[in-house]
Amino acid sequence: MNVRVRFAPSPTGFVHIGSLRTALYNYLFAKKMGGEYILRVEDTDQSRLVEGAIENMLNAMKWAGVNHSEGVILDDSGKVVQKGEYGPYIQSQRLDIYQEYIKQLLDSGKAYYCFCTKERLDEVRDAQRAAGETAKYDGHCKNLSKEEVEANIKAGIPYVIRLRLPENHTIKFTDLVRGDMEFNTNDLDDQVLMKTDGFPTYHFAVVVDDYLMKITHVIRGEEWVSSTPKHVYLYEAFGWEAPVFVHLPNILNKEKKKLSKRQGDVAVEDFKKKGYLPEGLVNYVALVGWSPEDNQELFTMEELEKAFSVERVSKSGGVFDTEKLNWVNQHYIKDGDDAYLTDLAIPFLIEDGFITEEEATNKYDFLKSMISVLKEKLQYVKEVTEHASIFFGDKIEVETEEGREFLRLEHIPTLIDALREKIEKTEVLNAEFVQAMLKEIQKEYKIKGKNLFMGSRIILTGQMHGPDLPKVMEVLGKETCLNRIAYVKNNIL
């Protein structure tokens, strides 16, 4: 079997983190099976379309490294184009195809015209709910004669086309995550297949498209489980073989409720704007609902491609833990290329007023050295603005009363003079020099431990804790270190 899977989002706005995971699992499954991964755009609900959403979605997938070679793609100029032999890959461009297949269902009696108004449908559903029944279509138009249908159409009465489900019919399918599943048509609705505007519903278009595009495995969210029996019956109605279904568990918040925008960051763009690395986000998202055979937690994309299997996808929802995401992402920042991270950090530093756009160029080497020191503390790149202040300016601000009290200790004036004297004498101030210098001060002035190391840190940075001090001082340079020592002596002591 030539495995073919698809990610088929609707261009309705931001790319939810759950959509990224669905795309990722489809991509990984295709890679594992040596198959094809397709991206199709499902835009049949024209009322919900957002301008630019297709471009945003494609850019998000490109950023994440979840790449496809068939379907809707961005060319080198950033233009949306389509590539592949089963197109069009945008549903609104396939309306003639859907008309052809809806006609087949009407001719075979597997679908029917429904002329019920919205008001009537609302009344029926309200009455059913009041009686404690499941709200669904009551079949009012199910048995209209051919003459009645033709007369209504000729009179211009708006209509939809519904799937004609047989009574008391058992629909079975196997889900690779949930196992064998069984539904009775008495519990299902005669689903609308074609809307009054001539556009197909999701339920109709997805079946036609998956069949014509030779999709072998449908990997999607668990919210579609209840619709799957209707899709399976549509395959039966056409005489087609249904694909294999894989329904992924929901991504949950810490309260075990479905993750939504009301609870904070849920869009890929939200995480990108904070400076999460694509490698970190993809690595973590892969683990929300899937577990590897061993306890490995850090995966490159290549490692995920080899390790992933749908058999190890969980039935129950996976909790999105931001702290765990931060831990994973921090690993990739620590190992990240300094220049790459600096380029990501510069917009945040400009936005918070640390540097100008001109300084981003003129002081690039300085910024790169700063990032090299700070990256071990960063969970995401935007956090650079919380730690960068120690690298800017000749004056320091002691942030806490505890720090100010420390500078009142008896040995501090001696330490200040010792630091100044030794730094003045050196021509090269680097981390190795600072380490040797502190050992000399310890030996010569009998200033030890916390008194030496924390005292030096407060004098040079204003902070009691922070990145490796010798590395910080190397980035600051001789002149800035001397200016800060003088400022503390003349203005703070």
Swiss-Prot record:
GO cellular component terms, A-Z: cytoplasm
Give the reactions, separated by semicolons, that this protein catalyses: tRNA(Glu) + L-glutamate + ATP = L-glutamyl-tRNA(Glu) + AMP + diphosphate
Localization in the cell: Cytoplasm
The record, for InterPro entries, names: aa-tRNA-synth_I_cd-bd, aa-tRNA-synth_I_codon-bd_sub2, aa_tRNA-synth_I_cd-bd_sf, Glu-tRNA-ligase_bac/mito, Glu/Gln-tRNA-synth, Glu/Gln-tRNA-synth_Ib_cat-dom, GluQ/Sye, GluRS_core
- Recorded E.C. number(s)? 6.1.1.17
* Keywords of the record: Aminoacyl-tRNA synthetase, ATP-binding, Cytoplasm, Ligase, Nucleotide-binding, Protein biosynthesis
Q: Where is this motif: 'KMSKS' region?
A: 258-262
Biological process (GO) annotations held by this record are: glutamyl-tRNA aminoacylation
Q: What is this protein called?
A: Glutamate--tRNA ligase
Q: Which organism is it from?
A: Clostridioides difficile (strain 630)
Encoding gene per record: gltX
